[in-house]
């Protein structure tokens, strides 16, 4: 019996992405284009196959008109919208401004663009919900593309709070992990798109054989509770590739979620996605920590807290029925078992140098343990506190027990644990505990106000003003300077007024923390290894020493040992205004200085997005991803009146740098100053006034006239000499002598007056004509680096002498 030969399925995973990129390249190169779209007097070339695949309208049009290269004239369609639609059809994504979104979707609906107007039967399309279309698609196996990069502040605040309330009720009741229905289709339209580590699923390409992975993923998206929540918003106002993420779950099975955490930085507006993801992992072997009320996550970002009342689920995945309250110290241990990567508020990167030891993850800590143990258990929470980023001069990583990390006075058990914990702490730590409790209550009050007022910038400013008013909870120096205090090399280099305000208590805090995170701007990319503290170096005398807050506190002595050898020597710039509240709005703008200019006065930072306040005064909303883009904008558009300019001494053209001005002199004016003369450079060497130029012209003209007058006088002398030689034979000797004397006197008079013979006007006229032909007066001014030479004394014309052609009458002989 003959056995059937085996068949092998060869599949290229990048086939779909390759087709996408190739079609896009062909569009930009205008290769193989077979249709022209005429819009607003302009034309766009495209491929009929792509347009037909993405729009039933174009498909019907091309089938009914089978021309080789048709020209489609689209009336009442803006050119920019049609170009954006082409980008969407070829790439599957497009960026649209908020004010143009409605008109753009209306055009897409009129042209019946797939992914923007249609809704599948099994799953609502977010983009179609935003467009308001109610039609259903015929292709049930194809996943519809989603809109990306739409500004997330289109979602109203009330929708956010309602969705959070539904989530909280579902979590408390112990329901199935499926998500509640969103209160509005617009919110589902603007939910972030899920990114995966595989090619994007294309519409119309499913054949039942090669898309098993895609079908499984799509089915998983419908059954899993992380349907709309596992995504990230590809927002143009945020920078990606940040290591900070909110994927805390240690389950190795969800590799897609772990991969996507490095794709983009989540914003405050994607709060629902984080809540959905926490609810979805009921099958994990770790305790799920779920918030039970819908509040914005300001307190979570500031204090490293993720819950107020905690509901626990069994490891098997089944709910325990009524939500039971876990002790606060158990929550601390649970948080230490999984490293928490909190998202940053202002776009700064946080990197943990080392993690906690496994011995601290086993049994829960009790409130009766010694203070170093409590401090060691709360190291992770201290490192996750974003007060060191958010508040300059605030509580720099204070020693706060776990009771203060979670919203107090919510659960009676939590309040009792907080009181018992506070009794065990010394007096110097009690002040810091009270300070952080006050800050946390302030954050809760601010969150309630934020639910009513949509402006998060006002909330931010109110928090900072409250911090400035209560100096009792603030230390006098910022976290950035305290990092420098640990260095043995820099301890003696930055001894200024700000560093003298460092307290011994802060130094002890830094030395006792087993894990410490880098949040300074200067070192966010450096990866220096010497920032973790050494607990063995802490002595009981240092622990019990009071905090010296006076300006006369001596600087701490430089440390020795392995830590000094491990940390490299690094000089960093220290900000002098440590207690200033005006520039507390964004600490990550510490280094925003271009040539000494304060560019921060033009900026307002809201959730990591830089907005130009100067342009906002003119009703122009300009936002920037990072501070370097804003620096360029502020320097070019708003600092032009204040920056120093270097004008060209010849044409007065302004330059921003002196070397550009000198290069302009060399190239344009054909002039170059040697390097040795740069210090003594004077523009007067290169400028000739109009009066001096007129004097030069007059002097040259007079010199040339005098020269020709002398030549004419010599010719007249020769003629007179020939006449005298002929007449001398007819005159008596005594008369000849007398006539010669008279002739000499007349010659001297003629020479002294510089005149011509009055009896010969024709000669004088001819001489004048020759003078006008030979003398050419140039209108150009010759500029040279050296002073103009003075005319020789022999050619100088005495002042007061006239150049008359005939001044005296000569008697006829």
Swiss-Prot record:
Protein location: Nucleus
UniProt keyword Oxidoreductase present: no
Keywords, in A-Z order: DNA-binding, Metal-binding, Nucleus, Phosphoprotein, Repeat, Transcription, Transcription regulation, Zinc, Zinc-finger
Top-rank taxon, per record: Eukaryota
CDD domains: BTB_POZ_BAB-like
Biased composition (Basic and acidic residues): 254-285
Main location: nucleus
Sequence positions bearing Phosphoserine: 203, 205-206, 682
Ranges for domain BTB: 33-98
BP-aspect Gene Ontology terms: branch fusion, open tracheal system; branching involved in open tracheal system development; chitin-based cuticle development; compound eye cone cell differentiation; compound eye corneal lens morphogenesis; dendrite regeneration; dorsal appendage formation; dorsal trunk growth, open tracheal system
A Pfam family matched in the record: BTB
Annotated Low complexity bias: 125-145
Biased composition (Polar residues): 176-187, 302-324, 356-369, 377-388
First and last residues of each zinc finger (C2H2-type): 610-638, 646-669
Compositional bias ranges of the Basic residues kind: 192-201, 560-578
Subunit structure: Interacts with CoRest/CG33525, suggesting that it acts by recruiting a CoRest-containing corepressor complex. Interacts with phyl.
Name used for this protein in its record: Protein tramtrack, alpha isoform
Source organism of the structure: Drosophila melanogaster
Phylogenetic lineage: Eukaryota, Metazoa, Ecdysozoa, Arthropoda, Hexapoda
């Amino acid at each position: 019996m003959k056995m059937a030969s085996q068949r092998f399925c060869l599949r290229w995973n990048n086939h779909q992405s390759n087709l996408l990129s190739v079609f896009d390249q062909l569009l930009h190169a205008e290769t193989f284009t077979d249709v022209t779209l005429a819009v607003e007097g302009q034309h766009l070339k495209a491929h009929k196959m792509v347009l037909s695949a993405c729009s039933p309208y174009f498909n019907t049009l091309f089938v009914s008109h089978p021309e080789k290269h048709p020209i489609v004239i689209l009336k009442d369609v803006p050119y920019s919208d049609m170009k954006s639609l082409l980008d969407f059809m070829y790439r599957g994504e497009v960026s649209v401004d908020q004010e143009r979104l409605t008109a753009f979707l209306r055009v897409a609906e009129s042209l019946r663009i797939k992914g923007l107007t249609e809704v599948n039967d099994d799953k609502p399309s977010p983009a179609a919900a935003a467009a308001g279309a109610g039609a259903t698609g015929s292709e049930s196996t194809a996943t519809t593309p989603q809109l990306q990069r739409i500004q997330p502040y289109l979602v109203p605040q009330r929708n956010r709070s309602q969705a959070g309330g539904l989530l909280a009720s579902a979590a408390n009741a112990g329901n199935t992990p499926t998500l509640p229905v969103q209160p509005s289709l617009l919110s589902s339209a603007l939910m972030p798109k899920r990114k995966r580590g595989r090619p994007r699923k294309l519409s119309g390409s499913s054949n039942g054989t090669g898309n098993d992975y895609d079908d499984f993923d799509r089915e998983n998206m419908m059954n899993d509770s992380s349907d709309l929540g596992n995504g990230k918003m590809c927002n143009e106002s945020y920078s990606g590739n940040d290591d900070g993420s909110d994927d805390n779950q240690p389950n190795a099975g969800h590799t897609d979620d772990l991969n996507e955490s490095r794709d983009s930085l989540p914003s405050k507006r994607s709060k629902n996605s984080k809540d959905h993801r926490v609810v979805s992992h009921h099958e994990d072997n770790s305790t799920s920590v779920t918030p039970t009320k819908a509040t914005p996550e300001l307190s979570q970002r500031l204090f490293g807290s993720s819950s107020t009342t905690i509901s626990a689920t069994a490891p098997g995945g089944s709910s325990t029925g009524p939500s039971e309250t876990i002790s606060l110290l158990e929550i601390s241990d649970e948080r230490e078992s999984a490293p928490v990567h909190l998202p940053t508020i202002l776009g700064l990167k946080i990197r943990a140098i080392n993690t906690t030891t496994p011995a601290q993850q086993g049994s829960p800590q009790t409130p009766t343990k010694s203070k170093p143990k409590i401090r060691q258990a709360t190291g992770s929470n201290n490192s996750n506190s974003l007060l060191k980023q958010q508040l300059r001069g605030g509580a720099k990583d204070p020693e706060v027990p776990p009771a203060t990390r979670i919203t107090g006075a919510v659960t009676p058990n939590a309040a009792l644990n907080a009181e018992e914990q506070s009794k065990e702490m010394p007096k110097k730590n009690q002040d810091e505990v009270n300070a952080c409790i006050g800050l946390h209550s302030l954050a809760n009050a601010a969150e309630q106000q934020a639910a009513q007022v949509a402006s998060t910038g006002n909330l931010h400013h109110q928090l900072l003003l409250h911090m400035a008013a209560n100096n009792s909870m603030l230390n006098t120096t910022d976290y950035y300077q305290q990092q420098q205090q640990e260095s043995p090399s820099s301890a003696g280099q930055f001894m200024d007024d700000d560093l003298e305000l460092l307290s011994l208590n802060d130094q002890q805090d830094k030395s006792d923390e087993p894990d410490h995170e880098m949040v300074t701007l200067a070192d966010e990319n450096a990866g220096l290894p010497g920032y973790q503290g050494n607990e063995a170096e802490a002595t009981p005398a240092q622990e019990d020493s009071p905090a010296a807050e006076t300006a006369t506190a001596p600087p701490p002595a430089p440390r020795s040992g392995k830590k000094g050898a491990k940390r490299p020597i690094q000089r960093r710039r220290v900000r002098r205004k440590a207690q200033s509240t005006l520039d507390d709005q964004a600490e990550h703008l510490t280094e925003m200085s271009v040539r000494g200019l304060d560019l921060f006065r033009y900026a307002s930072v809201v959730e990591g997005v830089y907005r130009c306040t100067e342009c906002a005064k003119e009703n122009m909303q300009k936002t920037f991803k990072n501070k370097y883009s804003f620096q360029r904008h502020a320097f070019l558009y708003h600092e032009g009146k204040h920056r120093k300019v270097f004008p060209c001494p010849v044409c007065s053209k302004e330059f921003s740098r002196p070397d550009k001005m000198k290069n302009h002199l060399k190239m344009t004016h054909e002039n170059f100053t040697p390097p040795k003369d740069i210090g003594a450079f004077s523009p007067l060497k290169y400028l000739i006034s109009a009066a001096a130029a007129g004097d030069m012209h007059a002097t040259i003209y007079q010199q040339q006239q005098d020269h020709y007058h002398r030549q004419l006088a010599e010719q007249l002398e020769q003629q007179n000499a020939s006449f005298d030689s002929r007449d001398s034979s007819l005159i008596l000797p005594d008369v000849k002598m007398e006539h010669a004397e008279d002739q000499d006197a007349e010659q001297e008079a003629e020479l002294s007056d510089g005149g011509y013979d009055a009896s010969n006007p024709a000669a004088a006229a001819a001489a004048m004509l020759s003078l006008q032909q030979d003398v050419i007066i140039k209108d150009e001014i010759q500029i040279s680096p050296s002073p103009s030479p003075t005319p020789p004394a022999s050619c100088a014309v005495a002042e007061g002498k006239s150049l008359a052609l005939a001044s005296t009458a000569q008697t006829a002989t």
